[in-house]
């Protein structure tokens, strides 16, 4: 039984989630059953809060509690200024009308035992998945009681960890997906599901061989870490803890967390947090704390989340004096908000910069090479911003250099930061089918000719951040496509898929080895 309501603590994400709901079952607290058979939980809430809540064995729409007349039961109260015990009685999970539908689900033996299974329902559009009940090894069950009186034919599918767009029953996607449905009836129904394979999941007991040269032990202070993708979803919350354990098991010592605010308009420029799209403060704090509990250092790298192509967004702005003042004000608010969160959470480093703010640098350029029109006061803005970050954050500050874009025009204010975070976007080869030796030679040349020179000139330590695609042609940054090649700037996007590109894991391994 879960307690779901109008607060974040009760699963309300204040977001436009699938199916038009704002709540997530996986984020709502689960009640514990006592020896007396009663269910309970404890919450810490601010006095005076207006609280609406209900009990559910679903998400508050599916399998919510119902009153004696069959209507949804919604409870409310004002949180008092002292500890209070609230005793409620649940009348029924059923509404009037159709009878329950029971699902009995078998999943493959290869399903990771630390994962859980979800059921996604589609009465008029896919809704957020609901975690279901494990009743045996690789066997799960769920009984759907209500609101059968409000729906007609309902499609359903099974997935792992609420990720039904990717970690779903393989039969439910593809060119000829199997679409299973049921229609509420006055007779109870039993549905048996056997998942043979999970989509995009090919576990193997055999290790994947990676041929590489001997690795010498690095000196103290060497950083080896993982940067987390900046796209997110509230349902990922349950994966934070196991993800940090996996990163620790890779022998990493650093995690780079990338919270975002969304850029929703360019005239005027609007930068604000969008629930359901951007990482919210409680989630950022939880992620950092999970990483620190594994002994990992944490760097916070706030990023902008553009609704359109970043180059098109900048080109479409009026970029007059008032426009720039608004942009600097709102960007500063975003960065300083994240610096405060980083300090409160115990992060050790804070990173600013990157590809998506290049036009706002002194003497800035748009992505087509034309002048951005940034005011002469831009240098002062960045100097002030770094000083303001230091007034809120006690850790180190890094500047993200988007290599090779304008890396040779380092702004003067970079002298104020402690180290460089070099985002590698340079191709490793000029040909479509290079070997690893050729790529290694090119990497060495670029490191010596560019990165080392920049590092020496600025007298700053640096961390090299690389992200290589698992696609044919990635080494030359010309991913094979029907009409030539696709060029992807990994500093501008966290991931990219294209139906015409060809997966090439061997090329990806060779790039990392180089």
Model regions: which residues?
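Glycoside hydrolase catalytic-domain groove-lining segments
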Residues: 279-281, 286-287, 293-297, 301, ...
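Short, acidic/polar
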Residues: 233-248, 328-341, 404-413, 510-514
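Structural recognition of the beta-strand scaffold that forms the well-ordered cores
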Residues: 2, 224-228, 253-259, 299-302, ...
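Compositionally biased low-complexity segments at domain edges in trafficked proteins
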Residues: 82-115, 184-217
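Aromatic-rich carbohydrate-binding modules that target alpha-glucans
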Residues: 1-50, 56-79, 106-151, 161-183
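Substrate-binding cleft and catalytic face of glycoside hydrolase catalytic domains
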Residues: 209-218, 250-270, 282-367
């Amino acid at each position: 039984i879960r307690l779901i309501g109008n607060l974040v603590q009760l699963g309300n994400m204040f977001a436009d989630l699938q199916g038009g709901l704002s709540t997530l079952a996986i984020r709502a607290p689960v009640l514990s059953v006592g020896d007396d058979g009663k269910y309970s939980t404890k919450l810490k809430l601010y006095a005076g809060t207006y609280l609406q809540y209900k009990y559910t064995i679903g998400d508050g729409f599916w399998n919510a509690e119902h009153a004696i007349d069959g209507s949804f039961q919604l409870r409310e109260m004002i949180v008092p200024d002292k500890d209070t015990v609230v005793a409620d009685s649940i009348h029924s999970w059923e509404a009037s009308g159709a009878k329950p539908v029971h699902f009995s689900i078998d999943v493959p033996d290869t399903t990771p035992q630390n994962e859980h299974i979800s059921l996604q329902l589609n009465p008029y559009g896919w809704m957020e998945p609901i975690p279901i009940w494990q009743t045996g090894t690789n066997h799960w069950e769920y009984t759907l009681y209500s609101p059968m009186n409000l729906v007609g034919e309902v499609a359903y599918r099974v997935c792992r960890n609420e990720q039904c767009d990717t970690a779903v029953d393989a039969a439910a996607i593809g060119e000829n997906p199997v679409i299973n449905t049921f229609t509420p009836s006055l007779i109870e129904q039993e549905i048996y599901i056997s998942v043979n394979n999970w989509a995009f999941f090919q576990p193997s007991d055999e290790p994947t061989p990676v041929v590489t040269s001997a690795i010498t032990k690095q000196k103290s202070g060497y950083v080896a870490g993982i940067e987390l993708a900046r796209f997110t979803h509230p349902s990922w919350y349950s994966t934070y803890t196991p993800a940090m354990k996996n990163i620790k098991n890779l022998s990493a010592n650093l995690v780079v967390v990338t919270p975002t605010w969304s850029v929703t308009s360019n005239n005027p420029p609007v930068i604000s947090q969008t629930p359901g799209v951007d990482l919210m403060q409680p989630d950022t704090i939880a992620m950092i704390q999970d990483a620190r509990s594994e002994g990992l250092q944490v760097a916070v790298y706030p990023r902008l989340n553009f609704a359109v192509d970043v180059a098109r967004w900048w080109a479409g702005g009026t970029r007059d004096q008032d426009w720039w003042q608004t942009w600097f004000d709102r960007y500063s608010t975003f960065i300083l908000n994240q610096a405060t969160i980083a300090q409160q959470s115990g992060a050790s480093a804070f990173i600013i910069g990157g590809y998506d703010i290049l036009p706002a640098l002194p003497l800035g350029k748009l992505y087509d090479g034309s002048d951005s029109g940034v005011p002469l006061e831009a240098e002062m803005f960045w100097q002030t911003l770094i000083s303001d970050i230091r007034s809120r954050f006690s850790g180190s500050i890094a500047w993200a250099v988007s290599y090779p874009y304008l890396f040779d025009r380092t702004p003067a204010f970079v002298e104020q930061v402690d180290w460089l975070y070099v985002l590698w976007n340079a191709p490793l080869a000029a040909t479509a089918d290079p070997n690893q030796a050729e790529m290694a030679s090119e990497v060495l040349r670029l490191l010596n000719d560019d990165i080392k020179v920049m590092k020496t000139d600025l007298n700053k330590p640096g961390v090299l951040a690389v992200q290589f695609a698992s696609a044919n042609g990635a080494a030359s940054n010309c991913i094979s496509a029907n009409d030539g090649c696709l060029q992807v700037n990994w500093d501008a996007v966290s991931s990219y898929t294209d139906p015409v590109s060809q997966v090439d894991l061997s090329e990806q391994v060779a790039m990392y080895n180089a």
